[in-house]
Amino acid sequence: MATINQLVRKPRVRQVTKSNVPALQACPQRRGVCTRVYTTTPKKPNSALRKVARVRLTNGFEVTSYIGGEGHNLQEHSVILIRGGRVKDLPGVRYHTVRGALDCSGVSDRRQGRSKYGAKRPKS
């Protein structure tokens, strides 16, 4: 335990935690323009064609964002909203596209978990 005199001379240093989503710069979401929309394959035990987009954000960052859900309407120059959240089996993908916001449409025919995919409530 440090004495009060020691703490006056040299105060305790706060530990700085590194952000998992640096491109958001402490914002909940960021807007950006798709520069490339493509599919990529996941890490070893899994196998698929995951849909991702390279996005140039309004703050100048260029990041890779995962496009969740079945089917999408994104192409180059689409304006999208991204949020934090990594994809465990895609190295370097730390952001998710927000479905149903800006140019990105919601998932059609989605019945459960609709809010995560920007799907409206179906007519009974």
Swiss-Prot record:
CDD domains: Ribosomal_S12. One of its GO terms (cellular component) is small ribosomal subunit. GO terms for biological process: translation. Keywords: Methylation, Ribonucleoprotein, Ribosomal protein, RNA-binding, rRNA-binding, tRNA-binding. The keyword Ribonucleoprotein applies. InterPro entries: NA-bd_OB-fold (IPR012340), Ribosomal_uS12 (IPR006032), Ribosomal_uS12_bac (IPR005679). The keyword Ribonucleoprotein applies. The modification 3-methylthioaspartic acid is found at D89. Gene3D superfamilies: Nucleic acid-binding proteins. Residues 113-124 have a biased composition (Basic residues). Residues 105-124 are annotated as: Disordered. GO terms for molecular function: rRNA binding; structural constituent of ribosome; tRNA binding. PANTHER family: 30S RIBOSOMAL PROTEIN S12 FAMILY MEMBER (PTHR11652). Belongs to the universal ribosomal protein uS12 family. With S4 and S5 plays an important role in translational accuracy. Part of the 30S ribosomal subunit. Contacts proteins S8 and S17. May interact with IF1 in the 30S initiation complex. This is Small ribosomal subunit protein uS12. The lineage of its organism: Bacteria, Pseudomonadati, Pseudomonadota, Gammaproteobacteria, Alteromonadales.
